[in-house]
Amino acid sequence: ADQAGIQKVVDGLAGQIDRGAVNADVIVDTGGEVIKTLTEGQTGRTLGDTSGIAAAFAAQLAQANGKFALTVAETPFETTKTERRIDVNLSTQTTTLYQNGQVYRTYTISSGAGDHATHTGNFRIGWKTEMQNMGCVPGYDYCTKDVPWVSYFNGDEGFHGTYWHNNFGTPMSHGCINMTIPQAKELYDWAYRGTEVSVHY
């Protein structure tokens, strides 16, 4: 076997094998369950001492054994967990985004009015869409076109942008949480499916 030729391959092994660890970045709920992985974690690898490998492999090849185990050290990755949840206070007409237990944003909103009061309870963000018509089908007594940045949390109740009024702080909707369009987009981008939503007075 060509030991010098093998040595050239050995000299390039570290460049192919060595890699730094990539830390994981995840969004979790208040129970610690992952609802969104932003970055997958990956262990790091470092090739061990390569001195003598070429000679040892050449000797093995002479015995018709072409399998050679390399010594590789692994470095574990770390995981950064960010907890997110949403609180809707119908008494104060506010929606607050919490990140790691701290207030991230607070918005003045308009919830459901009269017989269409927003339901209280504990929910999770489900289906999301950048724009849709609301109502506009039999069974609904209203039709609002091109409603932006919709994040549903309880059936047909959700957060969305509002262009047809600016009366935030007063219940105005058919059950949804009306927000300014920039605020609704910020919530849409921040709150992944599975994010907890608490609605209360």
Where are these regions (language model features)?
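Solvent-exposed coil/turn segments that connect beta secondary-structure elements
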Residues: 11, 22, 29-33, 39-43, ...
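Exported/periplasmic cell-wall-interacting domains
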Residues: 7, 117-122, 129-201
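Soluble periplasmic/extracytoplasmic beta-strand elements of cell-envelope proteins
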Residues: 27, 85-87, 96, 108, ...
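A structural motif detector for short, solvent-exposed N-terminal "entry" segments of globular domains
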Residues: 76-113
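A short, compositionally biased
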Residues: 20-22, 88-93, 145-146, 191-193
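Short glycine/threonine-rich beta-strand-turn micro-motifs
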Residues: 1-85, 92
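Short, mixed charged/polar active-site loops
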Residues: 34-35, 103-106, 120
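A short local loop/turn or secondary-structure capping micro-motif enriched for an aromatic residue
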Residues: 44-47, 105-106, 113-116, 133-134, ...
